[in-house]
Regions:
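N-terminal [4Fe-4S]-dependent radical SAM core
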Residues: 2-64
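Flexible mid-to-C-terminal extensions adjoining Fe-S/redox cofactors in radical SAM and related proteins
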Residues: 14, 331-422
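C-terminal accessory regions of radical SAM enzymes
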Residues: 19, 280-331, 361, 366-379
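Canonical Radical SAM [4Fe-4S] cluster-binding loop centered on the CxxxCxxC motif
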Residues: 58, 64-96
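Detector for the c-type heme attachment site
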Residues: 79-84, 215, 369-373, 383
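Short glycine-enriched, charge-decorated loop/helix-capping segments at active-site entrances
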Residues: 84, 88-92, 188-196, 384
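Radical SAM/AdoMet-radical enzyme domain recognition
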Residues: 98, 102-118, 127-250
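Radical SAM enzyme [4Fe-4S]-AdoMet core and its adjacent flexible, acidic
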Residues: 188-200, 207, 211-311, 334
Length: 422
């Protein structure tokens, strides 16, 4: 049996390098040099100290509250069935349920790190009173126990009002707005319940925050469907409408899911946009291409993980009925339930969930050089994984490694000024 790779050799526009997988350590090497465990021993030894072989024994540091199952849009590719999760979630969350979830989070989270409370739906701002009440309650309770806390929300922005803008500005919200591009692109798939386009309503709701964000961080998230992978055009349209941070999320399951023929197109479009933005960075400017800057930041931080996100570990999602799940995309799915107690995570069930999804236990992920960067991808989307989609991710990461080496050589201060030091 062939041992899984411990490093990945790659070339960049400035030279030859090796990525030591554990710890995402990038090592410059002479062209044509022979590599073995001896020459890379120092870096491999460091990787062994990171504990990547094990599932972490952690409690949630962040939770999302599924505020309501209702939504005022009827997006054709919605994974959540407009918040109803195929009938597994109904109604809206009560204040008591939300308070119990906040109490549980604060009871177990790490005091040395920031806790996060997110709001999801449906459309969470169909139930704005609860959001305002929870922010006040969580802020007060966190202050009582000396816990730093932050907030996030994913919204279509069509129901945002002045009081919501004030709340978002004042409480350092990470605001993610679901908007797919300019009006023609967006209105094709994101229609209201009367079948009308929603772009104008989205912009009316978010424009005040784009103009005056206060302490908020506003990001546009554009969903990509099969056959519509014009990333640069969408990016430029969203920049023209005032968004400064823009990310793209391809559909992998259900209506509009990318096919094997789409993935090479996605790769080319992603890299073409990133090449353009890299040129801006090298010229002394900045970029708002969130997927690209996230990859650069992860490489700079030496990020590597056997899990693609915090689902089931540092993150959990609470349904409208108060039950805890590993992921907001899995509400009502018994395989993702973290316990039967409405206010607590069962540590044993949590550990079983994580152990089963460790990337080194997954085929073919455990033989891939990108396994600690991709980490197997979203747990929910694992059934849609194909050779084509995996190759697309590897090609994207190879480009990001190249771009990272070029940027660190030409403009290392960009990382120190904006993204922390490795």
């Amino acid at each position: 049996m062939t041992a899984p790779p411990q490093w990945h050799r790659f070339g960049s526009r400035i030279g030859d390098h090796v990525l030591v997988l554990a710890g995402s350590q990038i090592v410059d090497v002479p062209e044509g040099a022979e590599l073995d465990t001896g020459s890379l021993g120092e870096f491999l030894a460091h990787g062994e100290t990171l504990g990547l072989d094990n599932a972490p024994d952690v409690r949630p540091q962040g939770i999302s509250l599924n505020v309501t199952s209702a939504c005022n849009l009827g997006c054709s590719y919605c994974y959540a069935d407009r918040g109803r999760f195929a009938g597994r979630q109904q109604g809206s969350m009560s204040r008591g349920t939300a308070a119990a979830a906040i109490d549980a989070l604060l009871r177990h989270c790490d005091r040395k790190a920031r806790a996060t409370v997110g709001f999801l739906g449906g459309e969470p701002f169909l139930h704005p009173a609860l959001i305002h009440e929870v922010v006040a309650y969580a802020g007060a309770r966190a202050a009582d126990v000396g816990q730093a806390i932050g907030f996030s929300v994913t919204t279509n922005a069509t129901r945002l009002r002045e009081a919501d803008h004030d709340l978002i500005r004042a409480n350092r919200f990470a605001l993610t707005v679901s908007v797919d591009g300019g009006p023609a692109t967006h209105d094709l798939l994101r229609r209201n319940l009367l079948g009308q386009g929603s772009f104008a309503d989205v912009m009316a709701g978010v424009a005040p925050l784009l103009a005056t964000p206060g302490q908020a961080m506003v990001t546009a998230r554009a969903t990509l469907v099969s056959g519509q992978l014009n990333l640069a055009q969408r990016y430029d349209a969203l920049r023209a409408h005032g968004f400064t941070r823009i990310g793209f999320s391809p559909v992998r399951l259900g209506f509009g899911a990318l096919t094997d023929d789409d993935w090479p197109v996605w790769t080319r479009a992603s890299i073409e946009l990133a090449e353009r933005e890299l040129a801006e960075l090298l010229a002394g400017s900045d970029t708002g291409y969130d997927n690209f800057t996230t990859a650069l930041r992860m490489l700079h931080a030496g990020a590597s993980s056997p899990f693609p996100c915090g689902a089931g570990g540092g993150y959990a999602s609470v349904a409208t009925d108060g039950r805890w799940y590993a992921c907001h995309r899995a509400i009502g799915n018994a395989d993702y339930a973290l316990g039967d107690d409405l206010a607590e995570v069962d540590p044993q069930r949590q550990q079983r969930f994580l152990v089963a999804r460790h990337v080194d236990r997954l085929e073919p992920c455990n033989s891939c050089w990108a396994r600690y960067l991709c980490s197997g991808g979203c747990h929910q989307e694992a059934p849609a994984r194909t050779d084509a989609s995996c190759q697309a991710i590897r090609d994207w990461l190879d480009f990001c490694l190249d771009a990272y080496c070029a940027l660190t050589a030409a403009r290392p201060e960009w990382f120190g000024d904006h993204h922390g030091n490795r």
